Amino acid sequence: MSTATAPRLPAPRSGASYHYQTTAAPAANTLSFAGHARQAARASGPRLSSRFVASAAAVLHKVKLVGPDGTEHEFEAPDDTYILEAAETAGVELPFSCRAGSCSTCAGRMSAGEVDQSEGSFLDDGQMAEGYLLTCISYPKADCVIHTHKEEDLY
């Protein structure tokens, strides 16, 4: 399981919308190269045009980080940005090492909210069920409260 969930706080949801235009492609197209004509095989069916536009507005979630000494930092984090990266942008220093979800240096424990940490492989399902997460590969999916500096709690 890759999604960790704590008691949920209400959060707005927004879906991504994709707009694209299709064009029919001919069965074959003649290309000339150095005076010679050659056929370029083309698969039949719809094609995405060069005007393909993907638009998805990131949803902002409030993230509260609680340090080992009780210090709290609160900031907004987009749902498409890692919590570690959003914290750094907000001026909050957190421990990290790999930035790839393959160690436990940035471990935290969530007491409220929901994150997506599907890119990680370090934590097992039991640890995630207990609310543990890795801030370097966790995207906020709802407002969150995360207790940081929890690496030693994992062992």
Swiss-Prot record:
This is Ferredoxin-6, chloroplastic. [2Fe-2S] cluster binds at C98, C103, C106, C136. It comes from Zea mays (Maize). Keywords: 2Fe-2S, Chloroplast, Electron transport, Iron, Iron-sulfur, Metal-binding, Plastid, Transit peptide, Transport. The keyword Chloroplast applies. GO terms for biological process: electron transport chain. Belongs to the 2Fe2S plant-type ferredoxin family. Induction: By nitrate. Its cofactor is [2Fe-2S] cluster. One of its GO terms (cellular component) is chloroplast. It is found in: Plastid, Chloroplast. Binds 1 [2Fe-2S] cluster. Residues 61-152 form the 2Fe-2S ferredoxin-type domain. It holds the Pfam family Fer2. Ferredoxins are iron-sulfur proteins that transfer electrons in a wide variety of metabolic reactions. InterPro entries: 2Fe-2S_ferredoxin-like_sf, 2Fe-2S_ferredoxin-type, 2Fe2S_fd_BS, Beta-grasp_dom_sf, Fd_pln. Its main location: plastid. GO terms for molecular function: 2 iron, 2 sulfur cluster binding; electron transfer activity; metal ion binding. Residues 1-58 form a transit peptide.
